Amino acid sequence: MSKSKKTTKKTTEEYIKEFFENLSIETSFEMEEAEEEIRLTLETQDSGMIIGYHGETLDALQLILALVLAKKQGAFKRVSIEVGDYKKNREEWLRKLASDAKEKAVSQSREVILEELKPWERRIIHLILAQDDEVVSESSGEGRERVLVVRPK
């Protein structure tokens, strides 16, 4: 690893540590930094507070941390935080949702609309169904009205 890469990673870790300290959240974390994304796995007693209602607080923290890091480092990277296995469990639920939507679309020969999904959740379902020969998925609508549509091919 080059010296500048090492320095950047250390600096990123320091900014993240400072971010959580400023919020009075005691946590330790592991960080993976890729070209377009920073992934954090948090260990904390405050996981419920960090996740919030339906993950809304977690989504907000990810965005705010990404913006803070972009301001400090001059480049925007998406931040993904895993805490209390929330995302892992949510992904398992999304896999089941995708499977059920596919089954319904194929068996009833009609489109199935999945509402109230966050952008990252729609992305996961799109990736799951992209490999499927029987259905196609697409997002439709704008903003909070955006839905995911699963239809037979």
Regions found by a protein language model. Give the residues of each.
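RNA-contacting regions in translation and RNA-metabolism proteins
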Residues: 1-153
